[in-house]
Amino acid sequence: MNKLISACAGAGKTPRIVSEAIQAIDKGERILIITYTINNQKEIYEKYKSLGGNDYKNFKVKGLFTFLLEDIIRPYQNVIFKERIESLIFNERDPHKIGNRTIFGRKEILDNGETNPLHFLTQNGNKAHSTYLSKLAKRIITKTKNAPIKRLEYIYNKLYFDEVQDLVGWDYEIIDAISKSKKISLTCVGDFRQTIYQTAITTKKPLSTIEKKQFYIDKNFEMEDISLCRRSILEICELSDTVHSNMGFSPTTSNVKVNDPNIMNHIGAFAVKDSDVNNYITRFNPVLLRSKVTSGKKYAIESLQKFTYGKAKGLGFDRVLILPTKEYISFLCGERDVFNDQKTESSKNKLYVALTRARYSVAIIYPDVIPKNCPLKIWTPE
């Protein structure tokens, strides 16, 4: 049975899947965990070691692009391209476009019916475009009648796709192909509220959270929700839940208890007036989260740890101070439709990520005249 584990922020999904992997290895099984970011790969290996894992022959972790190249494309690429694809080039934009103009000669199929190398590869032919890597992998799976999937069946018993919220479009064709295997147990893990990055520039669905969740329903994946947070106190969980309150996620609960008097004197979610920010920083020494690395320089932030919203993903801190965008202020003051006209869910998801980094207190900087409908406690210097 294939499974989707949808885990809230701070749920401990990495310990969960690594513990499962160790148990499976003890039974003689071979495990591959696939994830998107390098930081996540390191975190998984570190957790494996800390939990007592030591069988690195049967426990493997790969980045998504490495997996696609090594396990699907290269072993069978000669059905489409004869020259070895050495590596990939990471695309921050569509490699077939300059601005809104499509570059001539990049269509997938040439007039003679053959595959156009320039659709998938750089001009020298030895590097693949990252944004079309899953599409190329799917073409090879189809052309070889599932040969890469059969090869995977000989190598691994269990596959985990971690951070599946970052996958889009053609990536889901790969998941679909693997899910049809009768010999591989496939588990996908993620939190769709934390979709900040995505693996490709594409218009191919699924793209949105709703579309991605529907994919797993349509493919008959077993669904498991983990809504118990092991990082943040309940008040912070409840505030972060409001960001996606209309999207069908289970309410987040918390098992975090606070007994330290030095922590208990300031817990929860707070609004801090602009003119009080430096006093707040001096008192609590929070970690600053902001939209850009250049933001917030008018405050006394030199000694603080500082992260952009995206770079803070996966991290946790005792106390967090958020320098919000105007949209975040509006949302937190009750304008729940402020994100509706945006093309992607990235901005909304970054707010969720920022709020859920905090263990005990999260403070948001407001103008000195705080709107009357602000639901947060207002912090004032003693």
Regions found by a protein language model. Name each.
Residues 1-382:
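The feature marks helicase ATPase cores and/or their adjacent C-terminal helical subdomains
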